[in-house]
From Swiss-Prot:
InterPro entries: ATPase_AAA_core, P-loop_NTPase
Any one Gene Ontology molecular-function term assigned to this protein's record: ATP binding
Lineage: Viruses, Varidnaviria, Bamfordvirae, Nucleocytoviricota, Megaviricetes
Pfam families cross-referenced by the UniProt entry: AAA (PF00004)
Originating species: Acanthamoeba polyphaga mimivirus (APMV)
Protein's name according to its UniProt entry: Uncharacterized protein L712
SUPFAM superfamilies per record: P-loop containing nucleoside triphosphate hydrolases (SSF52540)
Length: 530
């Protein structure tokens, strides 16, 4: 209630308000609001002062200042005990109701973070926690909700404790989303490899991938030398930072994607990202690339200097298939829109002239218009690809090498104007073909050497091998058996892998199988069914 004081003015009486303008106080929210209200009331033309009015005014201002001071001090006092955040009370109640588990991520003397025997990547874990307002660099107790439960994250300089209820869904969340997805798999003392998966809301996720052994084919060795020379020349000459763009073209199963595992073992790159674009046909190429770049920036180690020294390899798999699927997806949506009608029934039984049935339709595209739209989508993609190759899309804070895997590279340029002819020459191209006899023998020798040089532990022998099994049985007894492979033998790398698995990686049996492949009941020619 506003305090009003009657004031005698001649023969009439009038009331005026002594209280400050609370609206102004709420608007400013500072001591200046109180001072402003005091001055406004003091110099108001309607005010006529008397001793009662001054005393009431001083009393009201004193009460306001006292209440404000008490509230500020009490909030600061309660904040010290975290009583203003009820998560601590909720979590205490939750601990009484459920059994809880604790996972500890420990900082090691070598600078790594480990959960039991699993190395954890801080470059991945940091953005995961930051999305939940948890700061690893600021030790404290944090809480975040998962479904109906609270998880407590207790951070110190040496460890991160994750405390959560022993409920199956929550345990799976911690194991999969915190531990598994943020584990660090380092190869070549430096490289971490990820595979892109599309999560909820079409958001790409970087999932760590265990790096497998890969045989160094002639193309792999040649490209490795080119990449090393590219980075060396860039250091010496200080060229403008643009992506080194490469095209792997060839039939499926010829080893294009496997290059990621091969080069990861060399320790040239800091990160390798494999992205099969076919799983993301709702967005154009630029959107997909920007999302991946954002994920890379979010997961960058904040302690590393942003001097452009980080080397990143991105492998876009099946990009020509993605382009066709993307175009067909857009055309399909246009066809659906052409079939849409909207009806609105109104009016009374008597038939109101102002209401009735309204039908809104879309005119179907003619085949010529549909083809024109397909060409427009294709040319837009090629323009975006041109910008990537010219260095206008990605930031310059990293060294990028981008490999575009295709089955039919030229099909992406079908019907394109001459201005895109120069784009074809901007890629360093490698043609992948099926393995011939010499490559088959080289690969079988590589597998043979892997078995010979592997040091079996007692645990391996007890768990994986039987008493009658001998690793030497998998190896080649006499290299002359390779002469039995037909000279005109041609087989894809993927199909050769299938033959190896079907024969339990016994090299002698594999060679025997290859020598009789035409009369085999399991495989026909070099195209082996899945």
């Amino acid at each position: 209630m506003a305090t009003q004081v009657p004031v005698q003015s001649g023969a009439e009486k009038s009331n005026f308000t002594l209280n400050p303008d609370y609206g102004k106080m709420m608007e400013f929210g500072t001591n200046s609001a109180i001072v402003s209200a005091f001055i406004q009331m003091l110099f108001s033309s309607k005010n006529k002062f008397s001793f009662p009015m001054v005393f009431v005014m001083i009393r009201n201002m004193a009460v306001l200042l006292l209440v404000k001071t008490c509230l500020e001090d009490s909030k600061a006092f309660l904040d010290k005990f975290k009583l203003t955040n009820l998560n601590s009370l909720k979590f205490s109640w939750q601990r009484m109701m459920h059994k809880h588990l604790t996972y500890t991520i420990q900082h090691q003397s070598n600078g790594k973070w480990m959960y039991e025997n699993t190395p954890i990547s801080m470059t991945l874990l940091t953005p995961f926690f930051e999305q939940r307002q948890i700061l690893i660099g600021r030790p404290d107790n944090y809480y975040y909700s998962y479904r109906t439960c609270l998880l407590k994250i207790s951070i110190t300089n040496e460890r991160i404790n994750i405390i959560f209820p022993d409920i199956q869904s929550v345990v799976q969340h911690v194991n999969n989303d915190i531990i598994h997805r943020n584990r660090e798999i380092i190869c070549g003392d430096r490289t971490v490899m990820y595979k892109v998966s599309i999560g909820n809301g079409a958001v790409p996720n970087l999932d760590p991938v265990a790096i497998s052994k890969a045989y160094g084919t002639d193309i792999y060795l040649q490209l490795e030398r080119s990449i090393r020379n590219y980075f060396f020349i860039d250091i010496v000459m200080k060229f403008q930072s643009i992506p080194f763009c490469i095209n792997f073209n060839g039939e499926p199963g010829t080893g294009k994607t496997t290059f990621g595992s091969y080069i990861a073992n060399k320790g040239i790159f800091d990160r390798i990202i494999i992205y099969n674009l076919v799983q993301s046909t709702n967005f154009d190429f630029k959107d997909n690339l920007n999302k991946i770049e954002m994920k890379i920036d979010q997961s960058t180690n904040k302690s590393k200097p942003m001097d452009g020294s980080e080397k990143v390899l991105i492998i876009f798999d099946e990009i020509d298939k993605w382009l066709e699927s993307y175009i067909e997806n857009k055309i399909h949506k246009m066809r659906d829109e052409a079939r849409v009608t909207k009806q609105s029934n109104g009016g009374s039984a008597g038939g109101d002239k102002n209401t009735g049935t309204i039908i809104e339709g879309f005119q179907k595209l003619t085949p010529e218009e549909e083809q024109e739209k397909k060409n427009q989508l294709r040319f837009t993609f090629l323009d975006q690809l041109y910008n990537v190759v010219d260095g206008h899309t990605l930031k310059n804070n990293k060294k990028y090498v981008i490999i575009f895997n295709t089955n039919h590279f030229d099909n992406m340029f079908v019907g394109s104007p001459e201005r895109f002819n120069a784009l074809k020459d901007r890629f360093q191209k490698y043609e992948f073909k099926k393995l011939r006899k010499r490559e088959i023998i080289n690969y079988l020798n590589y597998v043979n050497d892997c078995f010979k040089n592997y040091d079996l532990t007692e645990e391996d022998k007890n768990i994986l091998l039987s008493d009658t099994f001998d690793v030497d049985n998998l190896c080649v007894s006499n290299t002359n058996i390779y002469d039995d492979i037909p000279n005109d033998m041609v087989v894809s790398f993927r199909n050769l892998q299938k033959i190896l698995r079907a024969n339990h990686f016994n090299i002698n049996r594999v060679v025997e199988h290859l020598s009789q492949i035409e009369c085999s009941e399991i495989f026909t020619s070099d195209d082996i069914p899945s």
